[in-house]
């Protein structure tokens, strides 16, 4: 089986690309980093350093790479592969959608109507459905109808902490990852036979898993980063070692967890164990996870479908406590990082228009009581 994977960054190499290659899939990475592309094509392998109680390096083989700016090369791949995955970041999906539209149209014209499945492995809710909508903006109604027949747009939930690691001179492509990984896909959205990939779990209730991960791992990670930054530490593991930070992170995840328990009928004890597992992952002494990396892009993280506002809206829907989630929103608004364009834009908007206007613009919150709480805490 041949797959095209967009994004040869840490997640691409250390998580999705590795699972595919481990399952005997030949993986072609598409990226804009020509140095990395050359290294993949020259070395034809790279190491994945899995860190935890028993660290080890596993070698990934059966790989090649192309430059995603080379439209012809991308189109040729899309015309023939059986699976396409992405790990490019939510913001990039919209940029690559026109090329995907052109490539899928070319596959159609070439007469290849074999099933093709596309899975966006991004930190967003129903990322593949979003990607599909962006692709379809660039196609005619008749092209869309034909593509719908043989292309499956499969939503997924992904979870693995893959922070940047020090360069290994002997293997510049080596990537460091935690032991834990979770890749859950919506089995109802595939076209043709579902590929047999070790580590890819199938479900017909994806939203429960998407929101479990978003409301717990992503929410907790972000709160750890903001509190860690306020405490003056560099790494998530240092932040979570501070008792008051750990308590606040846990309390926030319990608030968002109450929404999940109500919405999806999760077992409270099982979810409490899931929270403890995540706290342990944050404390992994072998992972250097920078608080600025985790805290970056506050505008995206304040959006209505992301890790702060979505669970907060859930607490309002079910009449549940949300004090810690409101604190999270305040910390996102207070996040300052001169090297992060979104942080700069947010700070400027608040300076020009005030906190209440920023809450309205970026979060979509309409509950006046909550908006007033955010403004009061911010000031």
From Swiss-Prot:
GO biological process: mannitol catabolic process
Sorted UniProt keywords: NAD, Oxidoreductase
Gene Ontology molecular function: mannitol-1-phosphate 5-dehydrogenase activity
InterPro entries associated with the record: 6-PGluconate_DH-like_C_sf, 6PGD_dom2, Mannitol_1_phos_5_DH, Mannitol_DH, Mannitol_DH_C, Mannitol_DH_CS, Mannitol_DH_N, NAD(P)-bd_dom_sf
EC number: 1.1.1.17
EC main group: oxidoreductase
Name of a matching Pfam family: Mannitol_dh
Catalyses which reaction(s): D-mannitol 1-phosphate + NAD(+) = beta-D-fructose 6-phosphate + NADH + H(+)
Sequence positions that bind NAD(+): 3-14
GO cellular component: cytosol
Record's keyword annotation contains Cell inner membrane: no
Gene3D superfamilies: N-(1-d-carboxylethyl)-l-norvaline Dehydrogenase, domain 2, NAD(P)-binding Rossmann-like Domain
Family, similarity comment: Belongs to the mannitol dehydrogenase family.
Protein name: Mannitol-1-phosphate 5-dehydrogenase
Naturally occurring in which organism (per UniProt): Actinobacillus pleuropneumoniae serotype 5b (strain L20)
Phylogenetic placement of the source organism: Bacteria, Pseudomonadati, Pseudomonadota, Gammaproteobacteria, Pasteurellales
């Amino acid at each position: 089986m041949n797959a095209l994977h967009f994004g040869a960054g840490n997640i691409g190499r250390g998580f999705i690309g590795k699972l595919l290659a481990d399952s005997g899939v030949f993986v072609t990475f598409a990226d804009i980093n020509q140095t990395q592309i050359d290294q993949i094509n020259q070395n034809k392998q790279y190491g994945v350093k899995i860190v935890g109680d028993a660290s080890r390096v596993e070698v990934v083989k059966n790989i090649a790479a192309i430059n995603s700016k080379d439209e012809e090369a991308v189109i040729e791949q899309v015309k023939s592969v059986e699976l396409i995955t992405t790990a490019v970041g939510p913001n990039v999906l919209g940029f690559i959608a026109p090329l995907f539209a052109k490539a899928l149209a070319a596959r159609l014209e070439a007469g290849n109507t074999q099933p093709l499945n596309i899975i966006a492995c991004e930190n967003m809710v129903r990322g593949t459905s979003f990607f599909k909508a962006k692709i379809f903006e660039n196609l005619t109604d008749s092209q869309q109808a034909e593509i719908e027949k043989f292309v499956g747009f499969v939503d997924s939930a992904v979870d693995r902490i893959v922070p940047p690691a020090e360069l290994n001179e002997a293997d510049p492509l080596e990537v460091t990852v935690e032991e834990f990984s979770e890749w859950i896909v919506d089995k109802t959205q595939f076209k043709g036979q579902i590929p047999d990939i070790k580590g890819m779990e199938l479900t017909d209730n994806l939203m429960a898993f998407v929101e479990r991960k978003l409301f717990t791992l992503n929410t907790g990670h972000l709160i750890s980063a903001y509190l860690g930054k306020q405490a003056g530490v560099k790494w998530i593991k240092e932040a979570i070692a501070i008792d008051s930070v750990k308590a606040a992170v846990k309390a926030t995840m319990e608030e968002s967890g109450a929404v999940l328990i109500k919405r999806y009928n999760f077992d409270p004890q099982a979810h409490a164990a899931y929270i403890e597992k995540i706290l342990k992952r944050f404390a992994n002494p072998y992972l250097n996870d920078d608080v600025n990396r985790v805290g970056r892009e506050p505008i995206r993280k304040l959006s209505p479908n992301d890790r702060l506002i979505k669970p907060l809206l859930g607490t309002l829907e079910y009449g549940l406590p949300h004090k810690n989630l409101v604190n999270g929103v305040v910390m996102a608004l207070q996040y300052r990082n001169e090297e992060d364009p979104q942080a700069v834009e947010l700070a400027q908007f608040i300076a020009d228009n005030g906190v209440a206007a920023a809450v309205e613009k970026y979060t979509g919150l309409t509950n006046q009581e909550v908006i007033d709480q955010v403004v009061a805490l911010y000031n």
